[in-house]
Amino acid sequence: GMSGYIQGIPDFLKGYLHGISAANKHKKGRL
């Protein structure tokens, strides 16, 4: 399932993706 897929992602990549989602939220908040 999705949880197993996420567990297979290295921590640095999870942090990278989290940074992207945070940036997208920040952009939407400014619009």
Curated annotation (Swiss-Prot):
InterPro entries: Antimicrobial14. Keywords: Antibiotic, Antimicrobial, Bacteriocin. One of its GO terms (biological process) is killing of cells of another organism. It comes from the Bacteria. Antibacterial activity against several lactic acid bacteria, Listeria, Streptococci, etc. This is Bacteriocin lactocin-705. It comes from Lacticaseibacillus paracasei (Lactobacillus paracasei).
